[in-house]
């Protein structure tokens, strides 16, 4: 089961937490879910060059709190906070409630799975050889403390006629162990030959469960 399932979904309530944290009744649920999808799409498009790893959406009573995890907080905030204020006003229009935006810096982007996947796809779009991009990402991750990393690229790699899948792996990546902190990220490179999909698994070590850490 651990081989096929999304590693983040598999560990929800054990090690991982939800990226949307709110409760709604039956009528409001679809409305809130649609708003969350629109907000995420807007932020990912607007902050495409800001190295955003994850977006957390919380909804306390009649307002919203959005936490953006990024390795380049200065790009998100902008000069004297101008960019983040524009961002906040646009998100408020999408959600129809007062919004507070919080920025958290990713200290080690080299071991963040989503940022690794995004970096590889950017290199593929610039026509850098996929093997070089994948090997460089693995070396950087292992150098900065990852205990294991696995990368998969799938599509018309280097413009070949028949699409294929390539894997690179170093260290240990336990997919079945629930207490193993496995970070997972995906991205797509849109090249002249078609779309190339990239998946990244990063093993950062074994952790206590969320419940044990709270007790």
From Swiss-Prot:
Q: Name one GO cellular component term.
A: cytosolic small ribosomal subunit
What InterPro entries does its record include?
KH_dom, KH_dom-like_a/b, KH_dom_type_2, KH_sf_prok-type, Ribosomal_S3_C_sf, Ribosomal_uS3_bac-typ, Ribosomal_uS3_C, Ribosomal_uS3_CS
Gene3D superfamilies tied to this protein = 3.30.300.20, Ribosomal protein S3, C-terminal domain
Ranges for the KH type-2 domain? Answer: 39-107
Signal peptide feature range:
none
Molecular function terms from GO: mRNA binding; rRNA binding; structural constituent of ribosome
Membrane-spanning ranges? none
The answer on whether this UniProt entry bears the keyword rRNA-binding reads: yes
Q: Name one GO biological process term.
A: translation
**Entry keywords, A to Z:** Ribonucleoprotein, Ribosomal protein, RNA-binding, rRNA-binding
Q: Which domain of life is it from?
A: Bacteria
UniProt-listed Pfam families: KH_2, Ribosomal_S3_C
Q: Which NCBIfam families match?
A: rpsC_bact
Q: How does it assemble?
A: Part of the 30S ribosomal subunit. Forms a tight complex with proteins S10 and S14.
Family to which this protein belongs: Belongs to the universal ribosomal protein uS3 family.
Q: What does this protein do?
A: Binds the lower part of the 30S subunit head. Binds mRNA in the 70S ribosome, positioning it for translation.
Q: What protein am I looking at?
A: Small ribosomal subunit protein uS3
Instruction: Provide the taxonomic classification.
Output: Bacteria, Pseudomonadati, Pseudomonadota, Betaproteobacteria, Nitrosomonadales
């Amino acid at each position: 089961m651990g081989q096929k399932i999304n590693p983040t979904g598999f560990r929800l309530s054990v090690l991982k937490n939800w990226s949307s944290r709110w409760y709604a009744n039956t009528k409001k649920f679809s409305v809130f879910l649609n708003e969350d999808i629109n907000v995420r799409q807007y932020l990912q498009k607007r902050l495409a060059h800001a190295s955003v790893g994850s977006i957390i959406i919380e909804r306390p009573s009649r307002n919203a709190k959005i936490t953006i995890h990024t390795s380049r907080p200065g790009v998100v905030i902008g000069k004297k906070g101008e960019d983040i204020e524009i961002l906040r006003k646009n998100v408020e229009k999408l959600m129809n409630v007062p919004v507070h935006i919080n920025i958290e810096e990713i200290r080690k982007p080299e071991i963040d799975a989503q940022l690794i996947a995004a970096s590889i796809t950017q290199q593929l779009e610039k026509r850098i050889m996929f093997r070089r991009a994948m090997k460089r990402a693995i070396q950087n991750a292992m150098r900065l403390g990852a205990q294991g990393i696995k990368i998969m690229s799938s599509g018309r790699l280097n413009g070949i006629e028949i699409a294929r899948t390539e894997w690179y792996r170093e260290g240990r990546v336990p997919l079945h162990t629930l207490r193993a902190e496995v970070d997972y990220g995906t991205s797509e490179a849109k090249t002249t030959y078609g779309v190339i999909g990239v998946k990244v698994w990063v093993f950062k070590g074994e952790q206590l469960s969320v419940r044990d850490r709270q007790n």
